[in-house]
Every structure is written in structure tokens, then in C-alpha cells.
Swiss-Prot record:
Pro residues biased stretches: 602-612
Main location: cytoplasm
A Pfam match: Adaptin_N
GO molecular function terms listed in the Swiss-Prot or TrEMBL record: structural molecule activity
InterPro entries: ARM-like, ARM-type_fold, Clathrin/coatomer_adapt-like_N, Clathrin_app_Ig-like_sf, Coatomer/calthrin_app_sub_C, Coatomer_g_Cpla, Coatomer_gsu, Coatomer_gsu_app_Ig-like_dom
Listed Gene3D superfamilies: Coatomer, gamma subunit, appendage domain, Leucine-rich Repeat Variant, TATA-Binding Protein
Topology class, membrane: Peripheral membrane protein
Name this protein carries in UniProt: Coatomer subunit gamma-1
Assembly mode: Oligomeric complex that consists of at least the alpha, beta, beta', gamma, delta, epsilon and zeta subunits.
SUPFAM superfamilies registered for this protein in UniProt: ARM repeat (SSF48371), Clathrin adaptor appendage domain (SSF49348), Subdomain of clathrin and coatomer appendage domain (SSF55711)
Key words of the record: Cytoplasm, Cytoplasmic vesicle, ER-Golgi transport, Golgi apparatus, Membrane, Protein transport, Repeat, Transport
Length: 884
């Protein structure tokens, strides 16, 4: 083995390098020739194998020839009687993963070791054999493996059981035949054998709930003695309790009693596992109390691992049931000064969740002394906990905002500073009294901020919120400093922010004009262009609208064209005398190009430029407008994503795309024939619109021929009332003439047979008439909507699994675009606000504010507020929700 390389540094301190420092594959392969020596040197061979294993584990690749040569050389080492070398040989064979041809060569040696009198040889031979053999060879050694499972030596039995766990993935039918032997292993007096036996038995039965329930019921009566196996059994027991929700509560009681009994076990790991599982379950406060008591005792343990496990579990409980953890607050406060920073961090964040309003100031003082000693990742956790606490006790915002401000001045990375800024922004938006002090803290931060992203984000916030404060002029100095001192990106953001102050605060407009004129001499094009645009807009020289409201809409309004769609349209735009018309750009957020199924293996040539993405509506518009029957339908409003009408792996793959016009709907059926021996001709879809009374079929375009694996389209058009979100259910039958094809010659029989194929029903729902269009600033967009168009009502959504499910269901019904990440519901939240935007058929902009709350154990109530360009559309949104 290579000797450690020693080196003296300038401070005369010894630096010890890895014993493998500087080894090369070529040199090690040369050394591997020692395996062929007639007189084997076990020590030298062990060193060479160790180097080979090191290279393999470092990701070094061996060619096929190199791997084969090493494998054959290693097999020569079976003649050595050195136990240490033999164990390395086993490892080497596993790492090389020999091919099926090479496995035969080593199988006989491993079989011999598997029947050896040396237990170490037997155990390792079993592990290696099960790693390298296939199903055919497995049947030949199955008898030996079953015997090994019940072997008296625990090392051999564990090796066989662990091998069974690995083999179960590829050869489940064979391993399932070992159930009797595995059950016997579960009763073993050896801890590891019982642990591995229980793990394998559970995997064998994992798809049979009744068998798992019976297994758990039998084992919970006291036959499991191994602490490791006890931990597994606790997990399986909690799984049975969760899955038996259909049964009465009484039937779960024996299982829960077992979990409670484990809280009094002599093994600490069993106690912790039981407490953790009880804490994760939906139990009453009385049932949870024993687990909390046990965890509280562990908080004062002398073992760091027990303190960490206990405080981590309590931290999770505090997220959903903070009152249950309040009794532990005194012990948690003592852990804030724990030498282990992970324990201290968890203790602090738990206290922040369980603390009351009177303890906030004391907690903040302790946290201040603590923050400098922990890493950024832990600081982020603390900052997020403080944000939640501030929202819980808004009257304490001053002390917490002051803490966040001080944290901004400390050293830290981007993610840490971003977490603080995001927290301050959240508090500004949720606590009105905190707005001005929060904005000032952010202004002080950007005076010495090294992160361009954060500076731009804060400047954007200042532009939106600053003009609405009591003294907007106090922010101008901070903003203009960015124009003087920062990079081009931040300077451009600062110019836009100044313009917003000029537009909204008339008293500041002359001063803003002076500052913007100075920006006309900036070295960066973007900064100069923005300054020019805003000066001419605010001065009235460039007409962006007839009223002051139009000017503010220009400055503050949301950009309702997705940037990806705009980019695609600009790439296809050909410079001409006509100006670029942004109204022609698709406003759909989720764009999906129309793609045909490619033959397998066909890829674009290397280096070929990727085609620019084309919004789905643009692609479909070109196809539909080229069909004379549809050319008079007008502008395509929306195309849905494909809806599958057949199961996977069926004879014919069919999906449908719904194309929505103002007074028509076109159904595009995309069909693929997956049977090589068939050719389909005169293919059409018969659509029954009996359950869609407002629709009447006007025309259809059948498919003349549908060869194997060549997609084709069938179109069926319906007329409906103009600008009305008509809904209905359509049943579909695919009809065609099928002809046999000789796959060897490609010849098609002349005679065909009429046939039909029933496919799934299709529904046109209200969400199909809504475009998912985002707004960049929901608050400004909402305020700019006519308040007279607002309609508000409350609804009961019934029993739901969670608020997240309720939010997802309403978004799905409306088909609108969530804004500002509000579709994500914080875990265990009891109330939530979701903001949605979209464009309803007839090009009416719609904004929705949804307020959810839990009115009972799982009863969800919702308040729906809608604003729109058209008050009638606001009423329709309420009708959709009421009928949904």
C-alpha cells in the first residue's frame, strides 16, 4: 500500500495525506500481475486489491478488457488461505459485477465456500453469489439459501436474509417461497437475525394488507426482543393504524396500546421510535401526552443524540400542536445554550412556535446572542420561525423587525440575506403598521448590499409601496444613490422606481424630473432608454393614454403577455414597414407545442440549433385556419392541453384537444394506431352531444387513412351561444374500416371490415373558457379594477383532507393562474389566501381573491371576491363556483 506522504508547511505543522495520494490506474493494473505469482504474497495482494477498490469507488472506469483481466486474476486468489485476503476478494468480485459468462467461472469457487466449515466464508459467499447471479442460477442454490436462513450462526443467517431483501426486487416469486424459513428467523434469539428477518417478511407481504395486519397482531404480543426489530415493528404498527381508517377506532386500540407500551421499554431507541410515531399520528391530546412526557425527559439527557432526537420530534409536533409542547418550554430554554448548535437551533425554533406574547422579548434577546455562532443554514431556519411568530403576534413587530434589520448588517450569504428580506417584505404586506419602518430598514440595507437580485427586488418594492407612505420624500435619497453607485442592472431598477414616485406624488414630480434628466447621460443603454421613456411619458409628450389613470397603468400595470410567448413571437417576427403588434401574442401561460410522435431513435443532429418554442395557440391557429370549414370561426381564444381518451398500452392511442372560439368549439382528436398488422381507413369519431344541449354539430373532418405508428387528426366542430361558457358531456365512438397488413412485405389486403372502438367520454367545463394569464403585481391590478365590478360571497366546501386540497380543487374548477406563489399552502395552516388571475372568454380580465379557513375539524369555508372588466363576468365566476 502506498505510504503516507508527509510534508512540512511554513508553520512546521505536519500534514498527513491519504495513503492513496497520487495512485494511477495504469500503475495499479501493473501491480495486479502479482495475483498470478505461483507463491502468492497475501499482504501485497491485499494492498493491490485495496487500491483497485479505491479507484472503483472514486468513479474510475475500467474498460471491458481491463475489467475482465482483473476479474480473472482475482479468481486466482481463491487458492490463498489468508482470511483477510479472501474477504477482499469477495468485495472485488461484487464491485466488478462480472458478466453472465464470467459468473460461471467463479460460481464453483463461491459454491464451495458457501458449504465451507468456516462461517465467515459461508456468509460472504452467500452475499457475493446473490449479488452476481441471475434467476436461473438462483433456483440452483435456493435450497442452500433456505438452509442458511435458519442456520445456527447469526452471521450466516443475516447474510442470507439481507441477500433475500436484495433478490426480492428482481426475483420476487422465488423469494416468496421462503416465507416459512423467514418466519422462523423472526423468532430467532439473535438481534440482527430477528431484525433482518422481520424486514424481509414485511417486504414479502407488503402488498397484502390483511397479511401485514395479522403479522403485526401476532408479533406485538411479545415475541420480538431485538430493539432494532422493535423499531421496525413500531413502524409497521403505525402503518396498520393509518391504513385501517375504514375500521372502527376500537379495532385499532390494541395496536395503539402496543405503541404506548413501547414508551416504557428499556431501550432508548425503541422509546424514541414509539414517541415519534405517536406524535405523527392523528391522536387526542390525552393520547399524545405520554409521548411528550417521554421526550421531555430526553431533553435533559447527557447523550447529545437523545437530546437532538427529542427536540427534533418536539419541533415537528409544535408545527401543528404548539399547546401540547408548552410544558417543555423550560427544558427547551436550557437547550438554547447547548454546545451542539443543531440542538440549540431546534430548541429556539420550537420555542418560537410555542412561546406566548409575553415571552417574545426575552426570546429575541437570547436569540441575538446565539445567532453569531451558527451557520447560515441554521440562521435561515431561525429567521423563518421569527417571521411566523411575528405574524402570530403582530403587536410585537418592532422587536422582531429590529432583530431582522440587525441580522441584515451581519455577514452572511445570499440565501440567508434573501430569507431576511423575504421575511421583512411579508411583514410589510401583512402588518400595515410595520410598512414604514420595514421600508426604512430595507433602504439602509441596499446602501451596502452586494447582491444585485436583492437590490432590484427592494427597489421594486419601494416603487410600489413608498409613494403611499406618509413621507415619500425620505426614500428618494436612498434610491438615487443606487443610480450613482451601483451596476447597470440596479441603476435601471432605480430609474423605474424614481419614475413611480414621480407618477404618484405630484409634489415630488419636479425633483424626480431633475434626477431622471441626469440619468440621460448614463453609460448604459438600458438606463438611458428608461429615463427617456419615463420623462416623455410623465411630461405628456408621449401619449400612452388619455387620462392620468392610463399613465399609472402604463407604469404600474402588469405585463399580461408571458415572456416566453413574447420571445417566441419576436424571434419569428420579420422586420417590415408594419410595427410589431403585441396584441397578437398568445397570452396563455402554459404553452405546449403541437408535436407529432417521433419514430424511436431519431434525434436531431449534434450541434443543430434547437427550434424556438411556439405557443400552442399559435401552432393550432395555423392548422385550424388552413381548414376552410373553420376559417370563418374568428380568432382562436384558447386550446386546452390534450385529454387522454384511452388507457395506456391499448390498441389505439387517442387524446383530444378542445379549441375554444367565441361561438364555436372544435374538438381535435389525435389518433395513433399501435397495431403493426392493421391499417385503418375512413376513420371518424361519432360524437353524441345529447348531454350537451347548448352545442350543435356543424361539421367534421374524418381521417382518410391511419397507418401504424403514424399520428393523424380528426376534427369535429360545434356551434354554441356567443361568449357563453356552455358546458356539456360528449360520448365518443371511433369508427373505421380495418385492413390487414403483411408486416414482412408491407402489402395491404384489399378487403376491409367495418369496426368501431368505444373511447372515453369528454366534458367541456367552465375552466375551458378561462385563459391562465398572470399579473406581475396583483395588488396594483386589483386596485386598478373598477370596485363596482366586485362581487363577494361565502361558500362551504365541506369536508376536505387539508386546506391545500381545497385550494387545488377551486383552482381546478376556475382554471385560473395562481399569482405570487399563493397556490402553495403552508403545512398545517388553518387559514390561507389565494390570488388568481385570468382572462374570461370575451377578453374580460378577471381577478379573484380566495380566503380559506377551517370552520370545523376538517370543514373548509371559503370567501370569494371577484373583480372583472365586466360585472356580468364576476357574476358568472360565482355561478361556476356555486355549481362546481
Amino acid at each position: 500500500m502506498a505510504q503516507p506522504y508527509m510534508k512540512k508547511d511554513d508553520d512546521d505543522e505536519d500534514v498527513e495525506y491519504s495513503p492513496f495520494y497520487g495512485i494511477e490506474k495504469g500503475a495499479v493494473l501493473q501491480e495486479a500481475r502479482a495475483f498470478h505469482d505461483p507463491q502468492l504474497d497475501a499482504r501485497k495482494c491485499s494492498q493491490v486489491i485495496t487500491k483497485l477498490l479505491y479507484l472503483l469507488n472514486q468513479g474510475e472506469t475500467f474498460t471491458k478488457v481491463e475489467a475482465t483481466e482483473v476479474f480473472f486474476a482475482v479468481t486466482k486468489l481463491f487458492q490463498s488461505k489468508d482470511a483477510g485476503l479472501r474477504r477482499l476478494v469477495y468485495l472485488m468480485i461484487k464491485e466488478l459485477s462480472p458478466s453472465s459468462d464470467e459468473v460461471i467461472i467463479v460460481t464453483s469457487s463461491l459454491m464451495k465456500d458457501m458449504n465451507s466449515k468456516t462461517d465467515m466464508y459461508r456468509a460472504n459467499a452467500i452475499r457475493v453469489l446473490c449479488r452476481i447471479i441471475d434467476g436461473t442460477l438462483l433456483t440452483q442454490i435456493e435450497r442452500y439459501l433456505k438452509q442458511a436462513i435458519v442456520d445456527k450462526n447469526p452471521v450466516v443467517a443475516s447474510a442470507a436474509l439481507v441477500s433475500g431483501i436484495h433478490l426480492l426486487q428482481a426475483n420476487p416469486e422465488i423469494v416468496k417461497r421462503w416465507s416459512n424459513e423467514v418466519q422462523e428467523a423472526v423468532q430467532s434469539r439473535f438481534a440482527l437475525v430477528q431484525f433482518h428477518g422481520l424486514a424481509l417478511l414485511h417486504q414479502i407481504r407488503q402488498n397484502d394488507r390483511l397479511a401485514i395486519s395479522k403479522m403485526v397482531s401476532g408479533l406485538t404480543r411479545g415475541s420480538v426482543r431485538s430493539p432494532l426489530a422493535q423499531c421496525l415493528l413500531i413502524r409497521y404498527t403505525s402503518q396498520v393504524i393509518r391504513e385501517s381508517s375504514m375500521n372502527t377506532q376500537t379495532s385499532d386500540r390494541p395496536f395503539f396500546d402496543y405503541l404506548e407500551s413501547c414508551l416504557r421499554h428499556k431501550s432508548e431507541m425503541v422509546i424514541l421510535e414509539a414517541a415519534r410515531k405517536i406524535a405523527e399520528m392523528d391522536v387526542t391530546s390525552r393520547e399524545l401526552a405520554p409521548a411528550i412526557t417521554v421526550l421531555q425527559l430526553f431533553l435533559s439527557s447527557s447523550k447529545p443524540v437523545l437530546r437532538f432526537a427529542a427536540v427534533r420530534t418536539l419541533n415537528k409536533v409544535a408545527m401543528t400542536r404548539p399547546l401540547a409542547v408548552t410544558n417543555c418550554n423550560v427544558d427547551l430554554e436550557s437547550l438554547m445554550s447547548d454546545q451542539n448548535r443543531s440542538i440549540a437551533t431546534l430548541a429556539i425554533t420550537t420555542l418560537l412556535k410555542t412561546g406566548n406574547e409575553s415571552s417574545v422579548d426575552r426570546l429575541m434577546k437570547q436569540i441575538t446572542n446565539f445567532m453569531s455562532d451558527i451557520a447560515d443554514e441554521f440562521k435561515i431556519v431561525v429567521v423563518e420561525a421569527i417571521r411566523s411568530l411575528c405574524l402570530k403576534f403582530p403587536l410585537k413587530y418592532r422587536s422582531m423587525m429590529n432583530f431582522l434589520s440587525n441580522s441584515l448588517r451581519e455577514e452572511g450569504g445570499f440565501e440567508y440575506k434573501k430569507a431576511i428580506v423575504d421575511s421583512i417584505v411579508t411583514l410589510i404586506s401583512e402588518i400595515p403598521d410595520a410598512k414604514e419602518i420595514g421600508l426604512l430598514y430595507l433602504c439602509e440595507f441596499i446602501e451596502d448590499c452586494e447582491f444585485t437580485y436583492l437590490s432590484s427586488q427592494i427597489l421594486h418594492l419601494l416603487g410600489n409601496e413608498g409613494p403611499r407612505t406618509s413621507d415619500p420624500s425620505r426614500y428618494i435619497r436612498y434610491i438615487y444613490n443606487r443610480v450613482i453607485l451601483e451596476n447597470a442592472t440596479v441603476r435601471a431598477s432605480a430609474v423605474s422606481t424614481l419614475a413611480k414616485f414621480g407618477a404618484l406624488v405630484d409634489a415630488l414630480k419636479p425633483r424626480i424630473f431633475v434626477l431622471l434628466r441626469r440619468c440621460l447621460f448614463d453609460t448604459d443603454d438600458e438606463v438611458r432608454d428608461r429615463a427617456t421613456l419615463y420623462l416623455q411619458t410623465l411630461d405628456g409628450e408621449v401619449a400612452v393614454g388619455s387620462t392620468e389613470k392610463d399613465v399609472k397603468e402604463f407604469l404600474f400595470g402588469s405585463f399580461d403577455v408571458p415572456l416566453a410567448n413574447l420571445e417566441a413571437s419576436l424571434k419569428t417576427y420579420e422586420p417590415s414597414e408594419e410595427p410589431f403588434d403585441i396584441s397578437l401574442v398568445s397570452r396563455e401561460v402554459k404553452s405546449q407545442p403541437l408535436q407529432e410522435k417521433k419514430a424511436p431513435g431519431k434525434k436531431p443532429p449534434a450541434g443543430a440549433p434547437a427550434p424556438a418554442p411556439v405557443p400552442a395557440v399559435d401552432a393550432y391557429q395555423k392548422i385550424l385556419s388552413s381548414i376552410p370549414e373553420f376559417s370563418g370561426f374568428g380568432r382562436l381564444f384558447k386550446s386546452s392541453e390534450p385529454v387522454e381518451l384511452t388507457e395506456a398500452e391499448t390498441e389505439y392511442a387517442i387524446n383530444v384537444v378542445k379549441h375554444i372560439y367565441s361561438s364555436h368549439v372544435v374538438l381535435q382528436y389525435n389518433c395513433t394506431n399501435t397495431i403493426p398488422e392493421q391499417l385503418l381507413e375512413n376513420v371518424t369519431v361519432y360524437v353524441d352531444a345529447t348531454d350537451a344541449e347548448e352545442f350543435s354539430e356543424v361539421c367534421s373532418k374524418p381521417l382518410r387513412s391511419l397507418p401504424y405508428d403514424s399520428p393523424g387528426q380528426i376534427f369535429v366542430a360545434f356551434e354554441k351561444p356567443e361568449h357563453v361558457p356552455a358546458t356539456g358531456k360528449f360520448s365518443n365512438v371511433l369508427k373505421f374500416i380495418v385492413k390487414e397488413v403483411d408486416t414482412s412485405t408491407g402489402e395491404v389486403d384489399e378487403d376491409g371490415v367495418e369496426d368501431e372502438y368505444q373511447i372515453e367520454d369528454l366534458e367541456i367545463v367552465s375552466a375551458d373558457y378561462m385563459l391562465r394569464v398572470a399579473v406581475s403585481n396583483f395588488r396594483n391590478a386589483w386596485e386598478n379594477m373598477d370596485p363596482e365590478s366586485e362581487r363577494v360571497d361565502e361558500y362551504g366546501l365541506g369536508v376536505r383532507e387539508s386546506l391545500a386540497e381545497a385550494v387545488s380543487a377551486v383552482i381546478s374548477i376556475l382554471g385560473m393562474q395562481p399569482c405570487e406563489g399563493t397556490e402553495v399552502v403552508p403545512k398545517n395552516a388553518r387559514s390561507h389566501t389565494c390570488l388568481l388571475s385570468g382572462v374570461f372568454i370575451g377578453d374580460a380580465k378577471v381577478l379573484v381573491r380566495l380566503s380559506f379557513g377551517l370552520s370545523g375539524p376538517k370543514e373548509v369555508a371559503m370567501k370569494l371576491a371577484v373583480r372583472s372588466d365586466d360585472p356580468e363576468v364576476s357574476d358568472k365566476i360565482h355561478e361556476i363556483v356555486a355549481s362546481g
